[in-house]
Curated annotation (Swiss-Prot):
The lineage of its organism: Eukaryota, Amoebozoa, Evosea, Eumycetozoa, Dictyostelia. Belongs to the UPF0519 family. This is UPF0519 protein A. It comes from Dictyostelium discoideum (Social amoeba). It comes from the Eukaryota. The gene is sigN137.
Length: 68
């Protein structure tokens, strides 16, 4: 269940980045391009961390159930 939540949150992050890109397209200054790039990287990294966290939690539940 956590993995499904992680994937859905990753989709929300990518949608947020698309709207950020649209806003930055309206304002064509160099500084807004830099902000756009950092926002995209942060979204990708946090989405990947959410997926890793979900996998670790799932493994913890499995190991706990088996009793290793």
């Amino acid at each position: 269940m956590t993995i499904i939540n992680s994937i859905s949150s990753l989709g929300k992050i990518s949608n947020k980045n698309k709207s950020q890109n649209n806003l930055n397209g309206i304002n064509n200054s160099n500084s807004s391009s830099n902000i756009q790039g950092s926002n995209q990287n942060t979204g990708i990294v946090s989405g990947l961390l959410e997926i890793v966290r979900g996998v670790v939690l799932a493994l913890g539940v499995v190991v706990g159930a088996i009793g290793l």
